[in-house]
From Swiss-Prot:
<comment type="similarity">
    <text>Belongs to the NusB family.</text>
</comment>
<dbReference type="Pfam" id="PF01029">
    <property type="entry name" value="NusB"/>
</dbReference>
<dbReference type="InterPro" id="IPR035926">
    <property type="entry name" value="NusB-like_sf"/>
</dbReference>
<dbReference type="GO" id="GO:0005829">
    <property type="term" value="C:cytosol"/>
</dbReference>
<dbReference type="GO" id="GO:0003723">
    <property type="term" value="F:RNA binding"/>
</dbReference>
<protein>
    <recommendedName>
        <fullName>Transcription antitermination protein NusB</fullName>
    </recommendedName>
</protein>
<keyword id="KW-0694">RNA-binding</keyword>
<dbReference type="InterPro" id="IPR006027">
    <property type="entry name" value="NusB_RsmB_TIM44"/>
</dbReference>
<keyword id="KW-0805">Transcription regulation</keyword>
<dbReference type="InterPro" id="IPR011605">
    <property type="entry name" value="NusB_fam"/>
</dbReference>
<keyword id="KW-0889">Transcription antitermination</keyword>
<keyword id="KW-0804">Transcription</keyword>
<comment type="function">
    <text>Involved in transcription antitermination. Required for transcription of ribosomal RNA (rRNA) genes. Binds specifically to the boxA antiterminator sequence of the ribosomal RNA (rrn) operons.</text>
</comment>
<dbReference type="GO" id="GO:0031564">
    <property type="term" value="P:transcription antitermination"/>
</dbReference>
<dbReference type="GO" id="GO:0006353">
    <property type="term" value="P:DNA-templated transcription termination"/>
</dbReference>
Length: 138
């Protein structure tokens, strides 16, 4: 399994957790690791999910702050899952370049979101990166 597919699976799990309002990683781990997932990708999935769950309030607060005029409960569930994934990577996984996280989030948005989702996701992530000065640290 490639990192791209691992990222997609992680987004789907975050989506499922949100829909079920159950952010207990033990409940999803059993079916997460069925099949042929390489150890490196298992580690990635586990780390992203842990960071997203442990920092859910902080991540959601950032999403609300940068999605001007949009309350969290008005953001489409899939868009929210994509943003939570991307912010988990950008903020807590410094080994992943923020540009990769943004590009991959946009690709997921093109596949799973509405026609507006890629621009919405790009706008929020781009504003965050700019405001936080991450572009200066390249």
């Amino acid at each position: 399994m490639s990192r791209k597919l691992a990222r997609e699976l992680t987004m789907k799990v975050l989506f499922e957790m949100h829909i079920n309002n159950d952010f207990n990683i033990q409940r999803v781990e059993h079916h997460l690791f069925e099949g042929s997932i390489e150890e490196q990708q298992k580690e990635y999935i586990h780390k992203v999910l842990n960071e997203a769950i442990l920092n859910l309030e902080a991540i959601d607060s950032i999403i609300e702050e940068y999605s001007t005029s949009w309350k969290l409960n008005r953001i489409a569930n899939v868009d929210l899952a994509i943003l939570r994934l991307a912010f988990s990577e950008i903020i807590y996984m410094k080994d992943i370049p923020y540009r990769v996280s943004i590009n991959e989030a946009i690709e997921l948005a093109k596949i799973y979101g509405s026609d507006e989702t890629p621009n919405f996701v790009n706008g929020i992530l781009g504003k965050y990166v700019e405001q936080e000065g991450l572009m200066l640290n390249e």
